[in-house]
């Protein structure tokens, strides 16, 4: 059936910044939707405020907006662009909330809603409507009451009984949810949940804790044809959010009867809802009786549908987009086989395992338990012929230094109340001989999975050097998924020894295809996974070919920005007719889409796994510049193995990581650096700190995202850091730098071809020095730096890029002391940085593509990139933080990175651009009301001008007595600290009397008062800033929005002046 002729122009709503519960999977789905609609001749308009996405590239949609995602702003875009329809189902929970918001405001008259209509969204998101709907279908759901007050919640439990699951309606990743075992817990969780909910509603669910959880991905078209794309089994039982659970596909523990029952229910539900496109349905199954209940229906593409797409090779988002236009499944071709229609259900003859990646390494001291609220930032996926092989590959893919299962300390309580170490604790308990029945009782994990882990334990117990010299035993070890490093550790040998044994016995990886059809039809666009079974399906060509190493799972410090660069690199090579081979293991991202590269390998990014591919493909070179620290860490071992590293010489990469070599280089170039030292012990660190004077910045060498980095102000803090945060040794020294107080930091991205340097972007940080560059807001062009200082920065950047023989991208961070007119270099990274997508969007140049072309021999002059581009607009990048999902975390920013994603604001002036960036990041700055101010001692001398400006903008002011005294002459109401008794600032915040909070803190050991204030701001959604520079920028933004209407302008208009 042809597409709906009334639809000529469609607005695709993106999901906004990466956050816990809503990550790269929606860039993947949105990008697929853009491509899919354009293939059918539809004009596409995209709105998404995340600059790090592929979908916000100007060649992805006909028109791209990076405006904040609010119903009011999206409605302005709908009016301006005169679209016929909107597609909200590619934008996650954000997309659905925008659609329902537009509908409720009456702003969708005459506009078609594609995929799932507004009533369908409400039928599944509003729990009362969902309950009635399922009752009509005779489908069982857990008893549930939707309540709008704590009193109603207490009443609901009388019908259901404890324990209950408390979940806010219309939220993401279980935000604000929890399990209540008694009334006290119920009151606490329900109060918080009501504040979190988009519609001020909390769901009180009957507990099915301990039941098994299964998910079904279903597709339906307008002719009522339905297929099951994939079923998946959560290894963890109900009570652990599916985003927190280890997941396996296909489901391993469903008998034919139960499988058919869940399949029938899935098809019945999608038909009754009338969804056209993809839908995710979650079931709980009682392990004793086989009874099932429907837990949730997502009428949109989701994290699970991205996983199902990558696990099967069936592009759910792409096909959903075509169905939304009116096409039917039998009209849509399967892109992998090019023969079968999309109405053929995928068949898989392998096992897929997904493991979440948590951010607990960045938030020391917080509760690591996993449960109904999502905390993971990303995930990895691995494919094997057996569960044992797939799970061991997935563990390696996490990029956390694990070469396989590892023994950890645990208690029975840990097994009953799982943390991020769940898999290792299971392994350790089995290794210690704990009875599997007991483990099953404590964990509610199906014995099937416990047997599988026991297989690995038993096999490892047999490993000795002697046994490994038996070819059959060694082959079995590899078929179990054991890495060379793990086998070396178990046999007290080296990785090289194991590699030599494998060569001697001619035991090599064979590569199998993901082809959607279990090899029934020939795959035209295959992707591969490794195994040690017989039969290699990899066909190597004689073309020129290049390997690109991906960035692995999304984590704090290494986000979607690096995947963006990998995608651009692959597309650039394809443009040149070079065969591209991409290695990655992240199921959420665009880079692991089957049509981005010529060959995709879903593999761990380790030396062993990468070399396996290189040995068989024999590429002309490997690009390590774009995969963050994950791929950079492989540069030296790969080069030592004789692999050609393209672009910047690996000696230069290593040279800037080595402090002594880098210092010598800077001296040679007459570039200033803050005083520093390298310590191998606490005594050495203390001597350095006393020589260069406190405060000092301390950190381990070789890190990304500032992991375990702190500013310390005295010897006591230094000693605490050395004892608690790091293990120091001659192999792992500590870097001690003089901390430059009151400096302004800048980031510079440059392109270099070895002869010329192009300054792509100089970004001024909004936050003061000491806040990690990945957490600070930044602006292009710089707003407060004099031209002669900028010229010094340009000169330093050019000298450094040429001296290091950079071929491609480099990022350099500077600190400027304006009072001394001094420019200091903080660090240089001869690779793509997390700011590359932002700068690319701000100036309209695809930096990662150009960097790739340079690596293959092009020159900057070929692209007319010899002069810095002057832009007429202002672009601001703001960071987005996971504090709401991590209840014990403090919002104070420092040298260790905490943000998960970013937003962009673009306008003609700084104030409005900053306002848009804040709104896009979820910080709705007030135009009027009351501002509370409380600042640390050293900020008091600078607070008066800020207070004056706030008063002049018409705000009432309240402050603690010390801060109020420091701003003498400004009308400020004095308010008690929490520790001084009531009524105090906590009462004022809880009574919703405060509209903006300015609160700066005394370094690491922030006062309890400050923590309470900042935490309350997060919980209640009150805008807050934790630095004076942030406060100045916020007031500039408020002034701009008080005096001007917010206008919408596409990126195309900003860049091309259209």
Swiss-Prot record:
E.C. numbers: 6.3.4.16, 6.3.5.5
Annotated cofactor note: Binds 4 Mg(2+) or Mn(2+) ions per subunit.
Pathways involved: Amino-acid biosynthesis; L-arginine biosynthesis; carbamoyl phosphate from bicarbonate: step 1/1; Pyrimidine metabolism; UMP biosynthesis via de novo pathway; (S)-dihydroorotate from bicarbonate: step 1/3
Catalyzed reactions per annotation: hydrogencarbonate + L-glutamine + 2 ATP + H2O = carbamoyl phosphate + L-glutamate + 2 ADP + phosphate + 2 H(+)
Keyword Repeat: yes
Region of interest: Oligomerization domain: 400-538
Positions with a binding annotation for Mg(2+) 2: 296, 298
Region (Carboxyphosphate synthetic domain): 1-399
Stretches assigned to the ATP-grasp domain: 131-325, 663-856
Residues binding Mn(2+) 3: 813, 827
Binding-site positions, Mg(2+) 3: 813, 827
Residues that bind Mn(2+) 2: 296, 298
Cofactor(s) demanded: Mg(2+); Mn(2+)
Family matches, as InterPro entries: ATP-grasp (IPR011761), ATP_grasp_subdomain_1 (IPR013815), CarbamoylP_synth_lsu (IPR006275), CarbamoylP_synth_lsu_oligo (IPR005480), CarbamoylP_synth_lsu_oligo_sf (IPR036897), CbamoylP_synth_lsu-like_ATP-bd (IPR005479), CbamoylP_synth_lsu_CPSase_dom (IPR005483), MGS-like_dom (IPR011607)
Region of interest (Carbamoyl phosphate synthetic domain), residue spans: 539-924
Subunit structure, as described in the record: Composed of two chains; the small (or glutamine) chain promotes the hydrolysis of glutamine to ammonia, which is used by the large (or ammonia) chain to synthesize carbamoyl phosphate. Tetramer of heterodimers (alpha,beta)4.
UniProt function note: Large subunit of the glutamine-dependent carbamoyl phosphate synthetase (CPSase). CPSase catalyzes the formation of carbamoyl phosphate from the ammonia moiety of glutamine, carbonate, and phosphate donated by ATP, constituting the first step of 2 biosynthetic pathways, one leading to arginine and/or urea and the other to pyrimidine nucleotides.
The protein's name: Carbamoyl phosphate synthase large chain
Annotated source species: Methanobrevibacter smithii (strain ATCC 35061 / DSM 861 / OCM 144 / PS)
